[in-house]
Swiss-Prot record:
Protein name: ATP synthase subunit alpha
SUPFAM superfamilies registered for this protein in UniProt: C-terminal domain of alpha and beta subunits of F1 ATP synthase, N-terminal domain of alpha and beta subunits of F1 ATP synthase, P-loop containing nucleoside triphosphate hydrolases
Family to which this protein belongs: Belongs to the ATPase alpha/beta chains family.
Gene: atpA
Superkingdom as given in the UniProt entry: Bacteria
Catalytically driven reaction(s): ATP + H2O + 4 H(+)(in) = ADP + phosphate + 5 H(+)(out)
One CC-aspect GO term: proton-transporting ATP synthase complex
Residues the entry annotates as binding ATP: G169, D170, R171, G172, T173, G174, K175, T176
Entries under CDD domains matching the protein: ATP-synt_F1_alpha_C, ATP-synt_F1_alpha_N, F1-ATPase_alpha_CD
Lineage of the species this protein comes from: Bacteria, Pseudomonadati, Spirochaetota, Spirochaetia, Leptospirales
Pfam families for the chain: ATP-synt_ab, ATP-synt_ab_C, ATP-synt_ab_N
Length: 503
């Protein structure tokens, strides 16, 4: 066999001519010490604050402290897999998470990696975790309701699309239940929901996901979970990741979105832990000086965008856990001052069976009736006043003095309102049904119903109206107002008489 040398020579020459030597320059540092999720790195002279760095075993971190001789890096992963002497290289990019419709129905960690065992998420886009809040010119006033399906809230502490409403209370008062009921109530409305679980037990998150799946709410929801077992940096970054995932739908798809941060107290604790380990000076309650900015830059990203930017919205429901009802502690006062109102939950109301345990007296919505449909405005204003008067009279009546008939009637009606506002968990009411019930109790159409049977009557009333007078509900749903109060009054009188005959 004859070897064609000239052919081989020409191929070799061609290869040599085509050879290019690509020189890649990487800035590399060395881990000096590692522990508690924080690495001190020598080198990386030109690293930027907030830049992502990569350790030699593939774990990522973020440059937090830029000091004279070293860089303080927080580790987004298991720091036990990193050793002294490991090399660390710059990535020249900031922390980004995958975003897009591919994440709907999935459970992810704060880096956007799936943790539900359903395979990879092939998201086509990413967004920076930290992004600026929309400016004044990009916003419009909040005026469209975000229905929670909870009578006490939709009637007296209404939430609008683009609002930030704080849910605050001691542990075990039903804060998460209110947020999850609001997510369930968005079914069929086209609202995209993001539930961010921070520092919770993995078992609690699993049962929440299961509940959302069973109720058919997971298909329009993204769950971002940083459990109590995850490192502090992941718990710190979780709310910002969830917010970025929702922002994609607000900016790119022009949709209404709802984000629940459950809860920001644990995020502040994680941030305090990181700051102290980075040797940043502690302030009040050992929190760092910028803990207000931690929450303000997150919650300012909630907005109702102006029409020329697509009119999308991001509604935020941050949750704060208080200790023994102490709302004047550092983190609660910070978040109260940032948000557009708060829903207070009291443990004594919860214990006495008033659930949801909303204290209407000190809960406020700074958006107010702008976030209600006309039908709800027609019936709810009167109820808030009656309930406030009832609370005053109730304290007076406990003195055991003889009450005149008018005062007694007011007390009885107040008791009926309290009973009517009770609502089991995971059963949100459509707004037209709420309007009918509130109209009935405030206009005296329940005055003959015994207080103990008000809840039973509420169910009977709605079932009867759905079966026999469905046009009443249809008209409220379509016109968003009660167009014929007399007709509604006649229907309610009839139903009340029927109920009293049967019982």
């Amino acid at each position: 066999m004859k070897i064609k040398t000239d052919e081989i020579t020409s191929v070799l020459k061609q290869e040599i001519l085509n050879y290019k030597k690509d020189l890649g320059v990487e800035e590399v540092g060395t881990v000096l010490e590692i522990g508690d999720g924080i690495a001190r790195v020598f080198g990386l002279k030109n690293v930027m604050s907030g830049e992502m760095v990569e350790f030699q075993n593939g774990i990522f971190g973020q440059a937090f402290n830029l000091e004279d001789n070293s860089v303080g890096v927080v580790v987004y992963g298991n720091y036990l897999d990193i050793q002294e002497g490991f090399s660390v290289k710059r990535t020249n990019r900031i922390l980004e998470v995958p975003v897009g419709p591919e994440l709907l129905g999935r459970v992810v960690n704060p880096l956007g990696e799936p943790i539900d065992g359903k395979g990879p998420i092939n998201a086509k886009l990413t967004r920076p975790v930290e992004s600026p809040a929309p400016g004044i010119a990009m916003r419009q006033p909040v005026g469209e309701p975000m229905q929670t399906g909870i009578k006490a809230i939709d009637a007296m502490i209404p939430i609008g699309r683009g609002q930030r409403e704080l849910i605050i209370g001691d542990r075990g008062t039903g804060k998460t239940s209110i947020a999850l009921d609001t997510i369930l109530n968005q079914k069929g409305t086209g609202v995209i929901c993001v539930y961010v679980a921070i520092g919770q037990k993995a078992s609690t998150v699993a049962s929440t996901v299961e509940m959302l799946r069973n109720k058919g709410a997971l298909e329009y929801t993204i769950v971002v979970s940083a459990t109590a077992a995850d490192p502090a940096p992941l718990q710190y970054i979780a709310p910002y990741s969830g917010c970025s995932m929702a922002e994609y739908f607000m900016y790119n798809e022009k949709k209404a979105t709802l984000v629940v941060y459950d809860d920001l107290s644990k995020q502040a604790v994680a941030y305090r832990q990181m700051s102290l380990l980075l040797r940043r000076p502690p302030g009040r309650e050992a929190y760092p000086g910028d803990v207000f900015y931690l929450h303000s830059r997150l919650l300012e990203r909630a907005a109702k965008l102006d029409d020329k930017y697509g009119a999308g919205s991001l509604t935020a429901l941050p949750i704060i856990e208080t200790q023994e009802g102490e709302v004047s502690a550092y983190i609660p006062t910070n978040v109260i001052s940032i948000t557009d109102g708060q829903i207070y939950l009291q443990s004594n109301l919860f214990a006495s069976g008033n659930r949801p345990a909303v204290d209407v007296g000190i809960s406020v919505s700074r958006v107010g009736s702008a976030a209600q449909i006309k039908a709800m405005k027609q019936v709810a204003g009167k109820m808030k006043l009656e309930l406030a008067q009832f609370r005053d009279l109730e304290a007076f009546a406990q003195l055991g003095t003889e009450l005149d008939p008018a005062t007694q009637a007011q007390l009885d009606r107040g008791n009926r309102i309290v009973q009517m506002l009770k609502q089991p968990v995971s059963s949100p009411y459509p707004v037209e049904e709420q309007v009918v019930e509130i109209f009935a109790v405030t206009r005296g159409f329940m005055d003959k119903i015994p207080v103990a049977k008000v809840q039973e009557y509420g169910k009977y009333l709605l079932n009867t109206i759905k079966e026999q007078y469905s046009e009443v509900l249809d008209s409220i749903r379509k016109e968003k107002k009660i167009s014929d109060e007399e007709k509604l009054g006649e229907v309610l009188s009839k139903v009340a008489e029927e109920f009293l005959r049967k019982h």
